């Protein structure tokens, strides 16, 4: 039984189901748990399944990976199967395999793109079958196996197929065992476009009276393709084995619904062919050849009822050879000239007879001819070779007896490395097909009306002019398959508008010639225009088609309605013919436009349907329809090109190729979505050019079955676009020039643009996507462009990176540059009234000094230096701006050691809020400041606000902030001047006068050293008023305009009533606090002056009586004099523009300059200065626990920093690390009161702070905690314990918060495990050993740390009597530390400890009271390490501790259990200093006194004691100190 041609609603399923064994194995049944779109993409080599792809993983609808579509093999190219029906597979340039029972469908096939593309007519890729070549043509198909074996044909086409390269057929024969060998054939895959069904339980497919249960019908046959893998097992039922046939599945099995579901889930994309796929191919991957091969054609299936088995007819080599032998005339050999003579349909080339065709009907009569050697072929007459072609295996010239001789045939095949010079023409309308890797040179004379299609190799158009100087190589040329190159020897060889790039395109080599296109006709991204001529440039000019500007100019034709309620006479009226070429057609009260290639007699869409394959609905009214039709036509006229200009790097020789966009109107639009790598220039003289990426190609969703969320803006014609699945494009040219009000834009998914850009005459340049920009998508199926200006979703916007633009920009004469989601790397020179705008996602990296007339920022980032970091910077840039507005960020690279850095200079006007980001070169800065932002020449700065990102920047050892004076914003740190003489702070009036006379700053990168600034900047550790200001500034940045107004009020001296009520209240509150502070400071100053005088007198007396402890000890610099305060200082006006508000304006007058000629004291000598430290411990008042609170007194508290100044020379080793003299080093520049002198914690960088914090944490946990717990253990052992031996173990957990003026607040968590053994030597003597292991985790400010510590201690305890005892201990340990900021550092230190304790045990009934006192010496060695670029030297730390403790216990029994509650209190007076040197600057930290309170209980049962206790430790640097301990002891 044979198939009839499938038509909609014309297949009678009952005929097929009436017979269990039917030959109509035509269609696909697929699983339902995988998105249908995946099967579609797989069939069309789209999505992730492009040719050669190896990532073929498949996920189900729940996002779970269910395996690979193909295992360990590259993706196959399905284009060898015809694009519409998928029933004819090209295995030879002229032959395709199918089945003979589908002969009704084997007549015309299309390869490459689908029908209906705007740029290429359907007939261009049409191939007509001239002979089906049925296998055993007289043997009809039947139900027996033998009938199936003969169901096979190999059709011959009228032309060589150029769109696709043939696939090699299997050479393994027809035996099944070969194909069961997985070592040879590892994978099988099928494709088909028959009836489409999907397995779905509970539904059924019905046609006529027959039903297919658990099947849902999706589409009729030949509408679209599905591909996947067949069932896994080959011919389970051995009775179906036949040589030459291969089946998959079990013919004897009838699948239940569940079994079918399992069968369809054998592989990720398993599917089952049903109605509509007869003749569709099966492919196999041949591992021996490492390639896909054609295996067979689909001929048989087991029906809807079984759904269990399918079969293919294996390629028949002997049959193919027989056909080719019949179609080949033979081979012409020998050099020299050969004449081709004809007699009717017979001809001879020398002795070789060649059959010819008489007309198109007997084209199969034409034979192929092969030419070997080198020679000349002369056509004596016109040759109609029909379906015969010419195969050249040598160099040949083909010419006619005269210039008008023509040749018609299947095509020309030129072997690789060979060249044929073609000097004959082909008939008008005939298409000359060129295949083979060799070269064909067209070298005829005059005008040739024939056509050419280049499928492979090279074709050179070198046609000569005739006597009338007319030249035309071909009337039309197509470049297809991606394998061919067309070379033009002159620009007049062909009308460029008659050239097109078909399926997968190819190369057009302009070869130094200039070409002008109205539109470059192209199907897909395979098109490529190049210039391989390195001696001559080529210019490609695009003008675009004229746009329709008047909708009333569109023509309308009314078609007689199908019905009319008011007029029944229309039944009897004659039908008027419908004319072609009208713009609109009116019928049934609706207006329609005919699609390109649409049929006039086709039905028009109704019932809400907008379009079908032939018509598009345009509206109900003529005005609406004409407007829609005009937009529709204009969109079709967008000059879109999806190909690539020139060669990618390394893929050919790029000559100079220029592009010129000169639209026929200013509104003309051009869309480029392929990319470019030009050695030439892109010019836009008129029109609008848009560069864009493109969506990843996906197969059309004809039945709306895809479960993925598609982009609705581009879903017309069943197109599938996913908003976050696009392909990036790159564009490169020497220059891009835009002028005459033209525009040049880059949209989404343009990853790189490399070119210098020049814009003049009101031109607009928009680089990088921004919301509201046009997004355009060109359909590969139709060539139609759809554009949308709606904002992208966050998902889409985040799916592509910012466009990187490499090149300089020159703007003149009102030109404008707008950056969207883009990063510009280059210089900008803006002249005239040019404008530059940066948006939220914009970045600009300067590669040199730049000048911008008008710069507008919208939370944008400008990197003033293109160096990757400060270390690699060898030059610094200045940007000059005439007018600055908006809100943004400026990023600087600086070298404070050389007083160099990037700079912003604003000349005429400035408004907005700008954050400065600074990165300094490695090395310790020796400058106290550096100009960053200069707006001093701007008259009105009331709306300009400049702040430092994160409020500070770490440069070397110090932390800098900014200071603004007279419009100049500069880096500033009050400690940076330490170690150098500092002038007295001028009064506000004097400061104002000096600023007024300040010399003009230079514009270059070399920045003059600024004058001293004495007002301390805000910092993260400032008081509550400063913190409120900082938070307000942050909110202002987010809210932009509100922020600007708030900052304006905070800085401006002439504030008006327009301030918001909240800001007024804040300023008034600050003023009140300032007044209170002034009064307090005045009183404190007087008291401090008296106190200081007394202290100086005591110090002088003490030093006079003190003897030096070492011969080499140096003199100590006396403390600086007390500052002099005056209330007048607080009332004076301050002209500074610092953002720290009113508090920053409080500048006390200093008494005299700080004396700076002092000598340093080696840190190790501090260990011998216990007396001096005790004096210091009592010298100062204790500091408030809130380190942020502003104190009016100088920083003389024992928490205060010891030093932040720079040593003149580095220490020779860690033990020689020097510390600056106590208070002298502490004061920043002039000895200022606390309100102006920031604490060391606020002034040091992250690395310095981390080093200080780690050193303090190590001191506390290693030296102090370990000794304290050992002392407690010794004290709590009673004399009764001395009579027994014991072992014990304890585990202690700590949670601590630290705060000090020496370092910023941090927290620490620590666990400590101790194991000990106690041994009794006598009733009065005990000894013991303790092994301690601890692990600490620290969370520093923007850093972290980890310590592991191991220490061993020995102790002895002797009882003098029943009450008094004396104890001593000694120990040593090792500390391993890891510090993590933005860099890592690992280093080790060692520790030693020794202690002596005296105590007494008082027993009153059941009460025990144990007072004790002792002394302990602990020392932690030095360390030397690198933290990033900073060299860190940590001095050894020695702590001398005086302890006093009191333990209170009460003992009682509960049965055999003794319960002993415990209370204890201890005081630790710690004397010790440590130092950290970072980059040559020294900083100190101290151990402070601490109190500890504990409570717990001991449970004694026989010889086992369990202790549980918790403790709280208090100290000046310890905010929250809690710990808990569990201890178990066994006596024996």
UniProtKB/Swiss-Prot annotation:
InterPro entries: Autotransporte_beta, Autotransporte_beta_dom_sf, Autotransporter_pectin_lyase_C, Bact_Autotransporter_VF, Pectin_lyase_fold/virulence, Peptidase_S6, Peptidase_S6_dom, Pertactin_central. GO terms for biological process: proteolysis. It catalyses: Cleavage of immunoglobulin A molecules at certain Pro-|-Xaa bonds in the hinge region. No small molecule substrates are known. Residues 1-27 form the signal peptide. Residues 1280-1532 form the Autotransporter domain. The keyword rRNA-binding does not apply. The signal peptide, cleaved at the inner membrane, guides the autotransporter protein to the periplasmic space. Then, insertion of the C-terminal translocator domain in the outer membrane forms a hydrophilic pore for the translocation of the passenger domain to the bacterial cell surface, with subsequent cleavage. It comes from the Bacteria. Residues 1107-1116 have a biased composition (Basic residues). Residues 1045-1101, 1207-1217 have a biased composition (Basic and acidic residues). This is IgA-specific serine endopeptidase autotransporter. Its EC number is 3.4.21.72. This protease is specific for immunoglobulin A. The active site is at residue 278. It is an enzyme of class 3 (hydrolase). The record marks 986-987, 1018-1019, 1121-1122 as: Cleavage. Keywords: Autocatalytic cleavage, Cell outer membrane, Hydrolase, Membrane, Periplasm, Protease, Secreted, Serine protease, Signal, Transmembrane, Transmembrane beta strand, Zymogen. Transmembrane segments: none annotated. Residues 979-1136, 1166-1217 are annotated as: Disordered. Residues 989-1004 have a biased composition (Polar residues). The keyword Hydrolase applies. PROSITE patterns: AUTOTRANSPORTER (PS51208), PEPTIDASE_S6 (PS51691). Residues 28-322 form the Peptidase S6 domain. GO terms for cellular component: cell outer membrane; cell surface; extracellular region; periplasmic space. GO terms for molecular function: serine-type endopeptidase activity.
């Amino acid at each position: 039984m044979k198939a009839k041609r499938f038509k909609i609603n014309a297949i009678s399923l009952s005929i097929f189901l009436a017979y269990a064994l039917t030959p109509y194995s035509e269609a696909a049944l697929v699983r339902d748990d995988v998105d249908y779109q995946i099967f579609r993409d797989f069939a069309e080599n789209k999505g992730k399944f492009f040719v050669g792809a190896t990532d073929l993983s498949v996920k189900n609808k729940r996002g779970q990976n269910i395996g690979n579509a193909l295992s360990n093999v590259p993706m196959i190219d399905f284009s060898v199967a015809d694009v519409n029906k998928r029933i004819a597979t090209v295995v030879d340039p002229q032959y395709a395999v199918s089945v003979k029972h589908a002969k009704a469908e084997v007549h015309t096939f299309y390869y490459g793109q689908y029908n209906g593309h705007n740029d290429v007519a359907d007939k261009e890729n049409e191939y007509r079958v001239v002979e089906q070549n049925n296998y055993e043509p007289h043997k009809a198909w039947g139900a027996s196996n033998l009938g199936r074996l003969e169901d096979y044909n190999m059709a011959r086409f009228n032309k060589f197929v150029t769109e696709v390269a043939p696939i090699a057929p299997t050479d393994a024969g027809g035996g099944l065992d070969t194909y069961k060998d997985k070592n040879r054939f590892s994978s099988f895959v099928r494709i088909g476009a028959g009836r489409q069904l999907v397995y779905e339980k509970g539904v059924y497919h019905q046609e006529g009276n027959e039903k297919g249960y658990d099947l849902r019908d999706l589409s009729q046959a030949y509408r679209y393709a599905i591909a996947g893998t067949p069932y896994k097992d080959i011919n389970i039922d051995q009775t179906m084995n036949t040589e030459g046939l291969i089946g998959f599945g079990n013919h004897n099995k009838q699948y239940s619904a569940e079994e079918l579901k399992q069968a369809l889930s054998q592989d990720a994309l398993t599917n089952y062919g049903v109605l509509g796929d007869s003749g569709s191919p099966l492919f196999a991957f041949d591992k021996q050849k490492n390639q896909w091969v054609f295996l067979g054609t689909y001929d048989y299936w087991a029906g809807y009822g079984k759904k269990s088995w399918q079969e293919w007819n294996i390629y028949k080599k002997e049959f193919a050879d027989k056909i080719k032998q019949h179609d080949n005339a033979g081979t012409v050999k020998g050099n020299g000239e050969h004449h081709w003579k004809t007699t009717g349909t017979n001809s001879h080339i020398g002795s070789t007879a060649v059959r010819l065709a008489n007309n198109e009907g007997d084209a199969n009569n034409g034979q192929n001819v092969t030419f070997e050697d080198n020679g000349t072929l002369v056509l004596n007459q016109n040759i109609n070779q029909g379906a015969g072609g010419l195969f050249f295996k040598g160099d040949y010239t083909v010419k006619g007896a005269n210039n008008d001789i023509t040749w018609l045939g299947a095509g020309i095949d030129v072997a690789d490395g060979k060249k044929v010079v073609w000097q004959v023409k082909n008939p008008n309308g005939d298409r000359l097909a060129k295949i083979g890797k060799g070269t064909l040179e067209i070298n005829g004379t005059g005008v040739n009306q024939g056509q050419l299609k280049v499928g492979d190799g090279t074709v050179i158009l070198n046609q000569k002019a005739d006597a009338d100087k007319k030249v035309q190589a071909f009337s039309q040329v197509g470049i297809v398959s991606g394998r061919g190159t067309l070379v033009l020897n002159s620009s007049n060889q062909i009308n460029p508008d008659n050239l097109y790039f078909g399926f997968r395109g190819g190369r057009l080599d302009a070869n130094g010639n200039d070409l002008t296109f109205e539109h470059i006709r192209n199907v897909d991204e395979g098109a490529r225009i190049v210039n391989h001529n390195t001696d001559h440039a080529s210019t490609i000019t695009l003008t675009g088609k004229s746009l329709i500007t008047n909708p009333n100019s569109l023509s309308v034709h009314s078609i007689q309605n199908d019905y009319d309620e008011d007029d029944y006479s229309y039944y009897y009226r004659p039908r008027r013919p419908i004319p072609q070429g009208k713009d609109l057609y009116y019928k049934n009260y609706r207006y329609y436009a005919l699609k390109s290639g649409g049929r006039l007699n086709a039905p028009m869409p109704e019932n809400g349907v907008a379009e079908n394959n032939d018509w598009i609905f345009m509206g109900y009214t003529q005005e609406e329809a004409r407007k829609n039709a005009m937009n529709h036509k204009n969109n079709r006229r967008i000059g879109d090109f999806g190909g690539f200009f020139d060669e990618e790097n390394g893929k050919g020789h790029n000559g100079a190729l220029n592009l010129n966009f000169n639209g026929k109107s200013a509104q003309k639009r051009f869309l480029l979505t392929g990319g470019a790598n030009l050695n030439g220039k892109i010019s836009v003289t008129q029109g609008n050019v848009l560069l864009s990426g493109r969506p990843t190609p996906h197969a059309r969703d004809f039945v709306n079955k895809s479960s993925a969320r598609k982009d609705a803006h581009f879903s017309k014609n069943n197109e599938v676009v996913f908003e976050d699945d696009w392909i990036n494009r790159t564009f490169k040219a020497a220059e891009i020039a835009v002028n005459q009000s033209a525009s040049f834009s880059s949209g989404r998914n343009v990853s790189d643009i490399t070119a210098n850009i020049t814009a003049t005459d009101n031109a607009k340049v928009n680089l990088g996507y921004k919301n509201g920009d046009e997004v355009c998508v060109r359909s590969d199926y139709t060539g139609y462009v759809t554009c949308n200006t709606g904002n992208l979703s966050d998902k889409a916007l985040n799916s592509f990176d910012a466009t990187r633009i490499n090149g300089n920009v020159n703007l003149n004469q009102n030109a404008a540059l707008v950056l969207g989601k883009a990063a510009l790397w280059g210089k900008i020179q803006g002249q005239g009234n040019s404008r530059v705008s940066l948006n939220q996602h914009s970045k600009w990296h300067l590669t040199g000094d730049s000048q911008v007339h008008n710069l507008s920022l919208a939370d944008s980032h400008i990197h003033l230096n293109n160096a990757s970091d400060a270390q690699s910077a060898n030059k610094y840039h200045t940007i000059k701006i005439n007018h600055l507005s908006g809100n943004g960020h400026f990023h600087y690279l600086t070298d404070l050691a050389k007083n160099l850095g990037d700079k912003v200079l604003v000349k005429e006007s400035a408004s907005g809020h700008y954050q400065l980001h600074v990165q300094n070169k490695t090395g310790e800065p020796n400058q106290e400041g550096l100009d960053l932002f200069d707006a001093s020449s701007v008259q009105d700065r009331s709306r300009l606000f400049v702040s430092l990102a994160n409020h500070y920047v770490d440069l070397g050892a110090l932390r800098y902030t900014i200071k603004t004076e007279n419009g100049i914003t500069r880096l500033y740190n009050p400690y940076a001047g330490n170690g150098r003489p500092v002038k007295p702070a001028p009064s506000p009036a004097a400061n104002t006068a000096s600023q007024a006379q300040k010399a003009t700053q230079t514009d270059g990168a070399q920045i003059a050293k600024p004058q001293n600034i004495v007002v301390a900047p805000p910092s993260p550790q400032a008081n509550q008023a400063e913190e409120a200001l900082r938070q307000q500034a942050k909110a202002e940045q987010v809210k932009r305009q509100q922020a600007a107004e708030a900052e304006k009020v905070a800085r401006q001296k002439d504030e008006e009533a327009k301030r918001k009520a909240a800001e007024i209240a804040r300023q008034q509150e600050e003023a009140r606090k300032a007044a209170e502070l002034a009064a307090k400071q005045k009183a404190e100053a007087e008291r401090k002056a008296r106190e200081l005088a007394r202290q100086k007198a005591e110090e002088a007396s003490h030093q006079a009586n003190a003897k030096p402890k070492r011969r080499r000890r140096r003199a100590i610099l006396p403390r600086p004099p007390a500052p002099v305060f005056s209330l007048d200082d607080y009332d004076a006006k301050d002209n500074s523009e610092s953002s720290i508000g009113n508090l920053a304006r409080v500048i006390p007058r200093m008494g005299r300059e700080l004396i700076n000629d002092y000598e340093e004291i080696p840190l190790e000598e501090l260990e011998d200065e216990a007396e001096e430290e005790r004096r210091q411990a009592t010298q100062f008042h204790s500091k408030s626990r809130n380190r942020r609170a502003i104190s009016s007194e100088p920083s003389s508290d024992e928490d205060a920093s010891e030093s932040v100044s720079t040593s003149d020379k580095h220490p020779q080793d860690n033990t020689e690390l020097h510390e600056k003299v106590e208070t002298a080093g502490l004061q920043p520049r002039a000895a200022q009161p606390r309100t102006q002198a920031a604490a060391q914690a606020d002034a040091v960088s992250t690395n310095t702070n981390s080093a200080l914090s780690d050193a303090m944490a190590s001191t506390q946990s290693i030296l102090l905690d370990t000794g304290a717990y050992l002392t407690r253990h010794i004290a709590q052992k009673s004399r009764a314990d001395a009579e027994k031996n014991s072992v014990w173990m304890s585990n202690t957990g700590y949670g601590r918060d630290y705060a000090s003026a020496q370092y910023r607040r941090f927290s620490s968590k620590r666990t400590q495990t101790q194991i000990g053994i106690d041994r009794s030597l006598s009733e009065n003597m005990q000894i013991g050993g303790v092994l301690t292991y601890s692990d600490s985790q620290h969370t520093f400010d923007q850093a972290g740390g980890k310590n592991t510590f191991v220490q061993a201690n020995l102790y002895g305890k002797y009882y003098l009597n029943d009450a008094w005892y004396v104890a001593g201990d000694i120990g040593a340990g090792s500390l391993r530390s890891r510090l993590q900021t933005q860099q890592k550092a690992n280093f080790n230190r060692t520790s030693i400890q020794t202690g002596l304790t005296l105590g007494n045990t008082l027993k009153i009934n059941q009460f025990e009271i144990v007072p004790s006192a002792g002394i302990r010496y602990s020392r932690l060695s030095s360390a030397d390490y690198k933290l990033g670029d900073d060299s860190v030297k940590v001095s050894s730390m020695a702590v001398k501790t005086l302890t006093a403790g009191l333990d209170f216990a009460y003992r009682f029994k509960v049965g055999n259990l003794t319960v002993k509650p415990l209370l204890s209190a201890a005081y630790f007076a710690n004397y010790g200093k440590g130092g950290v040197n970072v980059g040559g600057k020294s900083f100190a930290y101290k151990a402070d006194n601490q109190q500890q309170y504990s409570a717990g209980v001991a449970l004694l049962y026989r010889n086992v004691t369990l202790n549980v206790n918790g403790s709280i430790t208090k100290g000046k640097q310890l905010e929250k100190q809690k710990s808990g301990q569990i201890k178990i002891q066994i006596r024996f």
